[in-house]
Amino acid sequence: MRNVIAFEQVSLDGFFVDGKGDMSWAHKQDPEWNAFAGSNASGDGALLFGRVTYEMMASFWPTPQAMESMPAVAEGMSRMPKFVFSRTLKKASWKNTTLVEGDVAAQVRKLKSEPGPGIAILGSGSIVSQLAQAGLIDEFQIVVNPIVLGKGRTLFEGVEEKIALKLMKSRAFGNGNVVLYYEPMA
């Protein structure tokens, strides 16, 4: 069975996007962080996005600018299979992308049961909320960024029941980011 990992960027005050829907604040690059991001993108995993995150990612990662600034990540993001959940997107131009329709939890349950590498959710807050509530996320990798936004959308917006998590490990970076690795408690 495939694992589903949510890799999410949040501000110190818990928002994954600011009040205008922007998350450019979450992209603090330095050599240490770039090496970490590159190693994450070098695996055989698959990616899962909602439409908004997909459109943001597809507008940058397949570009020459991305290849110049973070070549390992750009290559990995384009190489990996991508599953995009959308009710409105009719076509996906980024290579290795499959549009998925229907109930998100049911479709991810099906993807998890198929053979293949793990699946990472990047961004896609509403997808994370739905899958967390359905118990379909095996690990949360939460990157806490050293910034206070004051307002925005919380990552688990819409979750109606408590989800107990166990901290497995953490890693601090020189740029101020801290990655917290959580698993749901049984």
Report residues per predicted region.
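Enzymes that bind and transform nitrogen-containing heteroaromatic metabolites
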Residues: 1-186
